[in-house]
Structures are given as C-alpha cells and as structure tokens.
C-alpha cells in the first residue's frame, strides 16, 4: 500500500547531472540519489526547477523520473515534477509519473501565460482528476509571476488528490492563513531554504530544498533537531548553513548548486543554455561557504 502520510523533514529537489556535452549522466545521478538516502533525506523530487525541467525533452523528463523511482526503490518517496504552463502537458507528465511508480507529483503554477484564479483552479483540478497520485501545488511567484490565492487553494484542497503545497513565497503569514482556510490536514512544505525555520515555526511540515543537494546530512540533522524539540540546535545548524543558502541563490538555480557539487567532486557543473555557469563573484562566495562548513581546504 502506498505511503500517504505527510511528508516531513528534509526533501531534496534533485539536480540533473550532465556530461560535458549536455547528455544526462544517469550513473552520477544514481550516486547522488544514494548519497541523499544515506544522509537522511526523506523524499526526492526529480525533474523540477532544480532538475532543469524547462530544458529537458519530454522523453528525458520521463527517463529522469523513472530513473529516480527505480534507484530509490521504495527506500524514500519520490515526488515527481509534473509542471507545465500547458494543462495537457502537465496531465501527461502526471500520468507518466503514476505509471512508473512515483508516490506523488509536484505541479508548479503555470508560468508566462498568467492565468486568472479561475484558470489556475481549472488547471490544477484537471490534473488532479487525471491521476490518483497525491498532488502538491507549487507556488513560486518569482518565476511564475502569478500565484494561487489562499481562497483558491482552499477551493482546490476540496479535491481529495490535492494534499499539500510547496511554498516558495517566503511569506511567513501564508502557512497560517492556508491552515485556517483549508478544511482538512494539508501538507505544507517550504520551498525557501533561508526561511525554513520560520516556516516550521508557523506550522509547516518540512522543506523541499536546494542546499540539501550539497549538504544533505546537515539539512536532515536540522530538521531532526526541530522535530525532537532541540530548537537551539536547529537554529545553530541553520545559522551555520546560511552562507551556503545565500550563495545558492546569488544566480539562477541550479547554476550555483551544480558548481558547489562540482567543487566537491560529485558531478560536473554543466548546464543547458540559456543557463550558464556562475560568475566569478558567485563562485568565490560558494567556495567560501563550503570552506566555512569545512568541505573545502
């Protein structure tokens, strides 16, 4: 039986490692997934923003999700990226995720075409109707421009398959407002590494992080400390991580995180255009953050 309990703790939005010619490196991907599981990451999110989904072909997107499910092999859950600004494309992605055994799907707010709240409602309801998988709404107005209002989220939550949200707004009033508006247990996950402790304090359940690609053990430890009531320990870990959190978003994700992984010898820094490797100032900041964590000499 599928695990339908709430996601908690440190979840990782996985990078998609690539060879220098831009082909996906599935061997390295498997090693990164093993590293995540061994470090205590509670779930994996392939083929999202951090996984460069906008520049993956449909075939590649499907292979990345299937590869993650196969490699995880039930040890942790897989929440597959299934977002598109085309409802029909998102439906196909969600159906594929279900067909290969993903545990849930993460569907971003449609970007660029700027739908109204009614358009957002119909978009997400159509996807939720198309598959039995639990679905998470991904709110990231910095990339999508539009956002789901709390009222629309409450309407969407009436669908039994819509079970939670990834909230990258960094608005700490939002998880409280959503909790009060939604008339069922609703799984709220932060999508902002820097503000995760504030999000947890506001009643959130966990974080889908980027930094956890680099230091999955520290991110998992921070969440465990919080869950066990060791608040001072959680704060200390988060303070220690803050320079790396900051550096990860000095330029467009996933440029910085891939560079950081390359510095640790875990994958190369190859990105697909229009994304490019970080500039020198960003590279210096990442190196300094890694040294502060004693990960570089």
Swiss-Prot record:
The keyword Isomerase does not apply. It is found in: Cytoplasm. It is an enzyme of class 4 (lyase). Its main location: cytoplasm. The record marks 49, 112 as: Part of a proton relay during catalysis. It catalyses: L-aspartate 4-semialdehyde + pyruvate = (2S,4S)-4-hydroxy-2,3,4,5-tetrahydrodipicolinate + H2O + H(+). The active site is at 138 (proton donor/acceptor), 166 (schiff-base intermediate with substrate). SUPFAM superfamilies: Aldolase (SSF51569). Catalyzes the condensation of (S)-aspartate-beta-semialdehyde [(S)-ASA] and pyruvate to 4-hydroxy-tetrahydrodipicolinate (HTPA). Homotetramer; dimer of dimers. This is 4-hydroxy-tetrahydrodipicolinate synthase. It comes from Gluconobacter oxydans (strain 621H).
């Amino acid at each position: 039986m599928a695990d339908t309990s709430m996601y908690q703790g440190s979840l990782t939005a996985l990078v998609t490692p690539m060879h220098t010619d831009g082909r996906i490196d599935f061997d390295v991907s498997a090693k990164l997934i093993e590293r995540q599981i061994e470090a205590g990451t509670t779930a994996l999110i392939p083929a999202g923003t951090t996984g460069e989904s906008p520049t993956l072909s449909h075939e590649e997107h499907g292979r990345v999700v299937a590869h993650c499910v196969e490699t995880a092999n039930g040890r942790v859950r897989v929440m597959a990226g299934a977002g598109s600004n085309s409802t029909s494309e998102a439906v196909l992605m969600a159906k594929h995720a279900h067909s290969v055994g993903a545990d849930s799907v993460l569907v971003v707010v449609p970007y660029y075409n700027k739908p109204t709240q009614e358009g957002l409602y119909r978009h997400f309801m159509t996807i939720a109707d198309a598959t039995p998988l639990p679905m998470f709404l991904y709110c990231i107005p910095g990339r999508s421009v539009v956002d789901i209002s709390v009222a629309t989220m409450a309407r969407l939550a009436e669908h039994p398959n819509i079970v939670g949200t990834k909230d990258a707004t960094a608005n700490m009033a939002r998880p409280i407002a959503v909790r009060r508006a939604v008339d069922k247990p609703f799984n709220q996950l932060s999508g902002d590494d820097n503000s995760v402790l504030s999000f947890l304090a506001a009643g959130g359940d966990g974080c889908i992080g980027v930094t956890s690609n680099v230091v999955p053990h520290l991110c998992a430890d921070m969440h465990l400390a919080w869950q066990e009531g060791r608040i001072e320990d959680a704060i200390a870990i988060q303070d220690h991580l803050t320079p790396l959190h900051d550096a990860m978003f000095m330029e467009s994700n996933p440029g910085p995180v891939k560079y950081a992984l390359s510095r640790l010898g875990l994958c190369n820094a190859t990105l697909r255009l229009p994304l490019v490797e970080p500039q020198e100032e960003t590279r210096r900041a990442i190196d300094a953050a890694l040294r502060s964590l004693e990960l570089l000499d």
